[in-house]
Amino acid sequence: MNRLLIFAIILFSLSATAQRNPFANLTEKNGKIGIGTTTPDELLTVKGKIHTQEVLVDLEGAVAPDYVFETYYNGFSEMMPEYSLISLEELEAFLKENYHLPNVPSAETMRTEGISLKEMNLILLQKIEELTLYTLQQQKEIDALKEKISEK
């Protein structure tokens, strides 16, 4: 009798699961799709984690930070005329005052507004390029100091 009862419970559970609507978590409102939300605010809004193998982000309208090297080596960038690499002293002063890198949103801004992957990836690439230039400058200084020492 116990086995029959257990079998009936399992059978009922399986049939109830099979009858669930697999799209119950989807919402469409004003041409916008929501997954896990009833109030989508973009073309596709997902509330929760997304598991994917790859994400492709179009850079339409964005300027890749090649302007960092262009400005450094040419003294000017046609891609981004207003860009200039700040000195390490200026950078340190900015950090002491703001507690984050220039052109990088503050923790508070990220918390309240979120981040755009396209924008943040471009900012981070700019910072990597700037760090590369600072490192190259420091290496030149190290090499010059080594040469001075070896001359003595």
How should each PLM-predicted stretch be described?
Residues 41, 92, 125:
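Short glycine-/small-residue-rich flexible loop motifs, especially phosphate/cofactor-binding loops
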Residues 63-109:
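Short, positively charged
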Residues 109-152:
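C-terminal intramolecular chaperone/auto-processing assembly modules
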